[in-house]
Curated annotation (Swiss-Prot):
Keywords: ATP-binding, Cytoplasm, DNA damage, DNA repair, DNA replication, DNA-binding, Nucleotide-binding, SOS response. Belongs to the RecF family. The keyword Transport does not apply. It comes from Clostridium botulinum (strain 657 / Type Ba4). The gene is recF. The RecF protein is involved in DNA metabolism; it is required for DNA replication and normal SOS inducibility. RecF binds preferentially to single-stranded, linear DNA. It also seems to bind ATP. NCBIfam families: recf. Pfam families: SMC_N. Coiled coil: none annotated. This is DNA replication and repair protein RecF. Disulfide bonds: none annotated.
Amino acid sequence: MYIKNVHLINFRNYDDMYLELSPNTNIFVGNNAQGKTNILESIYYSSIGKSHRTNKDKDLIKWDKNNTYLRTYVSRERLDKTIDINIFKNGKKAITVNKIKIKKISELMGNLNVVMFSPEDLRIIKDSPGNRRKFLDIELCKINNVYYHDLVQYNKILSERNTALKNWNNKINDIIDIYDEQLSKYGAFIIKERNKYLDKLNIIGKNIHKKITNDLEDINFRYLTNIKDFDNAEKELLMFFKKNRKKDFERNSTSIGPHRDDFEVSINNIDTRIFGSQGQQRTAVLTLKFASLEIIKNIIGEYPVLLLDDVLSELDSNRQKFVLNSIDKIQTIITCTGIEEIDKYLDKKQSQLYLVNNGKIKRV
């Protein structure tokens, strides 16, 4: 899988930009705030229907325009895909794949698979459980439409349950019984799929991490949930919802479920979030990202596109070398402010360089 070309109209700081990409390594060089990350953002949006930088689609539209247009042409082994997206300031958007209108975001996912690695991804390790849940949910939604459906349903019912808790009486108690049964069904599936994904990360990630650290470190991922028996997750969840209902009423929120879960990343049996050095935390994220690439490849038979947003300068020479030696079979799109540090690791025959300046791109 690789992107042949991208066409942007009124997207961020681009007026009308058409870009041909190499199926191998593409490097965009320029100072900060020139539009490098905007290119990656447009590709990411074409993959999952949302930005990695903002929750407001109108932020993607050039400030003096009423809409933006994105076209991404994707070469696939079986069938090429042309993804067209129109986003309007009034909040509406229209998406087609090979000229067929997309009604749900789940229909967009899987046409273009990408893995994004940016400096902000360090939050997956360092920050709150919400960042780790978001990582799992995004990766699972890319490869599992049922997961996407059940996650949407779970969050919808969870919101309704929380609203009901604020107005609790005997009649609403019966309604909450129904919510609890639905949440248990969808929540059990989410928990089991997350745990399975972490099992895959453990198998693949351990080998990757050992390569990066020259066998000096062992990494482990462990799902943190109240569920003890995954085979009976639905029954356990239902029991917890009923048991905690009074407490939930007092707090006006649901205190247990996959929306509260977390996962632990440990290196040599030490919690990386609390005790890991910044170098170890970066390496853990690197492992997560490259393991995600392999998981997608194992499921769909093709590598996704790898997006590296100004991260190579954050890595030491050994980690830079690992990254650039691992992408020979993967279309990779890199942004950076200079290539001096990584130039010695690049395969010049497989690399295409672009200069970015104030929304203008020049192929070198």
